[in-house]
Design a protein with these regions (language model features):
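Short, basic, glycine/proline-bearing loop/turn elements
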Residues: 37, 104-110, 139-143
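Structural motif corresponding to alpha-helix initiation and N-cap regions
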Residues: 49, 95, 117-120
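Helix-to-loop junction immediately C-terminal to a conserved catalytic motif
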Residues: 30, 34-67
């Protein structure tokens, strides 16, 4: 009899609640930054997302964008609900604020010439672990009248070697306080034609050029969209 009562008691026990995954320090930091942006920051730096505006949370991605200001990290940070590691020049850590930000965001710091094996290996490690990386292939902020500065190699190769899709983010004007900025996000794409083969210098150069042409295509597309919006307001 006691065994029957014990069995019935076991049967009516409520299901155990799943323990919530404990957030890492980096995940907590990015969650805090996004809350700050969506509660107040977007009033100061309003961004209109165009193109593929869904959240890119399903896997790791290589985010690639043109570089006009220090605010360029925002479009990548709000494109997903997970952390993203920014590749940046080591010089940003030369002052206290830059060093603090780089440490908090776990940025991947590069030598000025862009050739840094340790940094590349670290970026590959993050991507293989399901984390995303953001790269500005111009290597520095564009303060000229040219659409893009000459690209430094690396973004396409990183995507190919880790078989990680690329998402392009382009802007036509430098983001400013209290001015709406338009950011175009591409759909994810891959350079599958280079997978599972030994890359030559010609392959790398060709992949870099394809990436640049795609960015130019989306740049002109965004420029035309903005122009049409202005014409409709007249």
């Amino acid at each position: 009899m006691s065994e029957e009562i014990k069995q019935e008691t076991q049967e009516v026990q409520p299901p155990q609640k799943r323990k919530k995954k404990k957030l890492t320090k980096l995940e907590k930091w990015f969650r805090f930054m996004r809350r700050c942006y969506f509660s107040l920051g977007r009033l100061l730096v309003p961004i209109k997302k165009l193109g593929h505006t869904e959240k890119f949370n399903d896997r790791s991605y290589v985010f690639v964008g043109n570089h006009l200001s220090v605010l360029d990290v925002v479009p990548a940070a709000i494109a997903l609900d997970k952390p993203v590691h920014f590749m940046a020049k080591k010089e940003i850590a030369n002052n206290r604020i830059g060093k603090w930000f780089a440490n908090k965001c776990e940025c991947i710091l590069l030598n000025r010439d862009g050739t840094d094996v340790r940094a590349v290996m670290l970026a590959m490690k993050y991507l293989k672990n399901g984390e995303s990386v953001c790269i500005f292939p111009e290597g520095t902020r564009n303060k000229t009248d040219e659409i893009f500065l000459p690209f430094k190699s690396g973004a396409a190769t990183l995507s190919i070697k880790t078989k990680t899709p690329i998402i392009i983010m382009v802007q036509c004007k430098k983001m400013r306080i209290f001015r709406r900025s338009y950011i175009y996000y591409s759909e994810p794409f891959e350079f599958t034609e280079y997978y599972n083969k030994k890359l030559t210098e010609d392959d790398i150069a060709a992949a870099d050029e394809k990436l640049k042409q795609k960015m130019l295509e989306f740049y002109y597309q965004l420029s035309e969209t903005i122009k049409n919006k202005k014409n409709r307001k007249k």
